Amino acid sequence: MLGGFPEPKTFGYRAYKFLSKNNYDIIIDNQSISHGMLKIQKNNPFIEIIHHPITFDFKFELAATEKIKHKISRYRWYSFLKMQKKVAPKIKNIITPSHSSKKGIIDEFNCFENAITVINNGLDADEFSPIESITPNPFRLITTASADVPLKGLDYSLKALKLLKKEFPKIHLVVIGKMKEGGHTERLIERLNISDSVFFKSNLSKNDIKELYASSSVAIVSSLYEGFGYPVIEAMSC
């Protein structure tokens, strides 16, 4: 894949054209960090939501890529970061879900600290709570990988599983997420010869996830970076 990803830039222009036709009490953008948002900011109360700087995704993907052709494709795909680095410092009001993300935004995007407000994400403790009727499987590990990308760190969990199987043959890993067919993770699982010990679960309801946590003995969070790690508090709540 050698294409780019122009959507953040083009979305900004489309949003400005559409939103300029009406008056709004407030306009909130989620992570496009585009030139169009600066135009919107001039005429409207405006907030930019930045979950975390996508520069982290780029760095980890680049480090995990070996072939020159694939490295070039990563530079092209993440070319929108140049725009975001220019736009972000000019945004007056930014909301982010954690102090870790706030630090990342300051360091990576050179934003002013007083322009950033931290509002933690919440979790419904009634939806994610212990299920006393389910006995945890002593050999079941569980992790979440919302995307088949290096940032999620699934490689480390899989390699650790390979080592653990030598001492605990029954041990297995449940992954909440969908494996990309023919992708890096599938190839790694085959290379490690652990296909019979890794189970991917996707399209789950919140109750399904709750039951999987309840049936597991250890929850693994192997992400290399998270702006706000939902799997951590979900696992702790269950």
Give residue spans per PLM region.
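Membrane-proximal helix-turn-helix segments that form the acceptor-binding/catalytic region
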Residues: K17, K71-I94
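Carbohydrate-associated surface elements
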Residues: S100, G122
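Glycosyltransferase donor-sugar binding loop
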Residues: T144-A145, H172-E186
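Nucleotide-activated donor-binding/catalytic signature segment of Leloir-type glycosyltransferases, i.e.
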Residues: T185-N207
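Aromatic "clamp/platform" in nucleotide-sugar-dependent glycosyltransferases that forms part
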Residues: L224
